[in-house]
């Protein structure tokens, strides 16, 4: 349930970008090929994407946005407080979804058991069944190409879609322009 998609986020020098494929699967059947699994939060200042149960993910998006509002858009404080709530709440602990959230300064993976993980390099994160393919491609393209952030995310997701049966080529990308502080 956690794996049937691919979400990739890249916090580059000029832009923060998140992308995801559009495939929705149920067991071994494709139910939909053009779903949107990424969105902007907090008046377009935060990017987020999910892998896992769609209904659970929408609940998590809404709850996380409440924390962003309460913390006035401070992504670091919001993920910490959200994680605490996730771990304490019996209903939240049963949700089957993971999220990536990022802005121009930070990128985090929020896991299904309430953990918050900041990627080691602080720049690239992925979740879902094609996540390892996408992050491998993104790291290689970052190191050996001159692609801009959006093109790097699109190409990495395309490579993941070539390899992962739960990921398709209907790729959607969102970005935040802006300099890092």
From Swiss-Prot:
It is an enzyme of class 3 (hydrolase). Keywords: Allosteric enzyme, Cytoplasm, Hydrolase, Metal-binding, Protease, Sodium, Threonine protease. It is found in: Cytoplasm. It holds the Pfam family Proteasome. One of its GO terms (molecular function) is metal ion binding. The active site is at residue 5. Its EC number is 3.4.25.2. Na(+) binds at residues 161, 164, 167. InterPro entries: ATP-dep_Prtase_HsIV_su, Ntn_hydrolases_N, Proteasome_sua/b, Proteasome_suB-type. One of its GO terms (biological process) is proteolysis involved in protein catabolic process. It catalyses: ATP-dependent cleavage of peptide bonds with broad specificity. Allosterically activated by HslU binding. One of its GO terms (cellular component) is HslUV protease complex. A double ring-shaped homohexamer of HslV is capped on each side by a ring-shaped HslU homohexamer. The assembly of the HslU/HslV complex is dependent on binding of ATP. Protease subunit of a proteasome-like degradation complex believed to be a general protein degrading machinery. Belongs to the peptidase T1B family. HslV subfamily. This is ATP-dependent protease subunit HslV. The gene is hslV.
